[in-house]
UniProtKB/Swiss-Prot annotation:
Gene Ontology, cellular component aspect: cytosolic large ribosomal subunit
Protein's UniProt name: Large ribosomal subunit protein uL30
Keyword Glycosyltransferase recorded: no
Superkingdom: Bacteria
Record text on subunit structure and interactions: Part of the 50S ribosomal subunit.
Family: Belongs to the universal ribosomal protein uL30 family.
Keywords from the named record: Ribonucleoprotein, Ribosomal protein
GO biological process, one term: translation
GO molecular function: structural constituent of ribosome
Amino acid sequence: MAKKLEITLTRSLIGRPQDQRVTVNTLGLRKMHQTVVQEDNAAIRGMVNKVSHLVTVKEIEA
């Protein structure tokens, strides 16, 4: 089965640079404590690494 990532926005975007805000929005996160499920690939991993201080990530089997 393909692995997926469960990504939750845990820190606020207030006062964050524009590139971090865009990255979080590109991941599909709009509000605090919102969770999205994304495919586990290099592009998503790169975005998560860029904003790792703002999100929590869990690997799930889907």
